[in-house]
């Protein structure tokens, strides 16, 4: 792509020193926290094979850690890019690296949305709990997530270009292409998944507050975890997608108007907002530690598996199975009473009465 649409001002993502410095700091912090954190999650869950089947939530968290860890492995490359102000891998590397970033972004947000939907079903439809442990279901869902992410990430590679052999950034053939691409990315990678997360967690919290086992300490613990996940997701991704929308609006605005000039400012701010989105890949392991911190003294390094063994899905499913057992064993208790009636002539009438009452 030889001719690229550029907003007024000829700004690039390396133009603002403050954005470069902020981006570098966020990338370093993300790598410091996220690489060992996600590595620990993968180590803890990959080899866990409970006899009842791995909970779907644990499988989704495992793949979420894989997606986050993959993009965090690229942080040294981006730190070098921002600090040296030159892209080191050429045109092919420019497209390939940003494709991996987009793939990880879509996989992460889709897995987060699917995880919130799973938690909602585990609370509102407890009879589905055994089915949610099905390995076949997990394989189908994960295949769909990764295939969707592979397809949705394609524009990130198509619209990346190495400018002047030193800046790897977006290159659209026209303003219409820029507006369409950036708007679609925000819709599919933020608006729809974030709306799903908010809706599912809203339903889950409403159900937990009204349920007997949702009150007290456990209800507070679940509520804090839900609030932290939603807050982190929204805060860390919102600036990136705000820049997307700003540039999309600027691309369609009159070239000499104030909105068009804001597109250049958004381009210059992209380094910092992209690095902040990178930081979202390191947050989830920290949230798991805060959620299951009381399990550390008892479970040690395997506290994460203990967390999912005692998750809401397991408890609700257990309660559902216990309720089924009560219904099945009640007639047997009546039969025991009937057996005593054979030795007692008066027992037969009571046996028939009890059976009819049940």
UniProtKB/Swiss-Prot annotation:
Its main location: membrane. The keyword Cytoplasm does not apply. It comes from the Eukaryota. Glycans are attached at residue 10. It is found in: Cell membrane. It is a multi-pass membrane protein. Residues 46-60, 118-140, 207-225, 297-358 are cytoplasmic. GO terms for biological process: keratinocyte migration; neuropeptide signaling pathway; signal transduction. Residues 315-358 are annotated as: Disordered. The chain crosses the membrane at residues 25-45, 61-81, 97-117, 141-161, 186-206, 226-246, 276-296. Residues 1-24, 82-96, 162-185, 247-275 are extracellular. The keyword Repeat does not apply. GO terms for cellular component: membrane; nucleoplasm; plasma membrane. Low-affinity receptor for leukotrienes including leukotriene B4. Mediates chemotaxis of granulocytes and macrophages. The response is mediated via G-proteins that activate a phosphatidylinositol-calcium second messenger system. This is Leukotriene B4 receptor 2. It comes from Rattus norvegicus. The gene is Ltb4r2.
């Amino acid at each position: 792509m030889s001719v690229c649409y550029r907003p007024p001002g000829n700004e690039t993502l390396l133009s603002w020193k403050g954005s470069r410095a902020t981006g570098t700091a966020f990338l370093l912090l993300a790598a410091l926290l996220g690489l060992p954190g996600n590595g620990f999650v993968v180590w803890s869950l990959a080899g866990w094979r409970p006899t009842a089947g791995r909970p779907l939530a644990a499988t989704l968290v495992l793949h979420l850690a894989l997606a986050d860890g993959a993009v965090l492995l690229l942080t040294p490359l981006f730190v070098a890019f921002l600090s040296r102000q030159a892209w080191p891998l050429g045109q092919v590397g420019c497209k390939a690296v940003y494709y991996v970033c987009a793939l990880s972004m879509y996989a992460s947000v889709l897995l987060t949305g699917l995880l919130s939907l799973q938690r909602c079903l585990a609370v509102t439809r407890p009879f589905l709990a055994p089915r949610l442990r099905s390995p076949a279901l997990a394989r189908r869902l994960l295949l769909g997530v990764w295939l969707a992410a592979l397809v949705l990430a394609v524009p990130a590679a198509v619209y990346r270009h190495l400018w002047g052999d030193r800046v790897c950034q977006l290159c659209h053939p026209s303003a219409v292409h820029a507006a369409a691409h950036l708007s679609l990315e925000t819709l599919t990678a933020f608006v729809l998944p974030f709306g799903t997360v908010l809706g599912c967690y809203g339903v889950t919290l409403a159900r937990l507050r009204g349920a007997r086992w949702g009150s007290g300490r456990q209800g507070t613990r679940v509520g804090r975890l839900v609030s932290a996940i939603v807050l982190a997701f929204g805060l860390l991704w919102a600036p990136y997608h705000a820049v997307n929308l700003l540039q999309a609006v600027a691309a369609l605005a009159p070239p000499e108007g104030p909105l068009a000039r804001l597109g250049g400012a958004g381009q210059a701010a992209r380094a910092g907002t992209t690095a902040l989105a990178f930081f979202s890949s390191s947050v989830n392991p920290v949230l798991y530690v805060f959620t299951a911190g009381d399990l550390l003294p008892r479970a040690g390094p395997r506290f994460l598996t203990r967390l999912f063994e005692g998750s809401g899905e397991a408890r609700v499913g257990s309660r559902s199975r216990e309720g089924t057992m009560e219904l099945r064993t009640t007639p047997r208790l009546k039969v025991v009473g009937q057996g005593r009636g054979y030795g007692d002539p008066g027992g037969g009438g009571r046996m028939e009465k009890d059976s009819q009452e049940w």
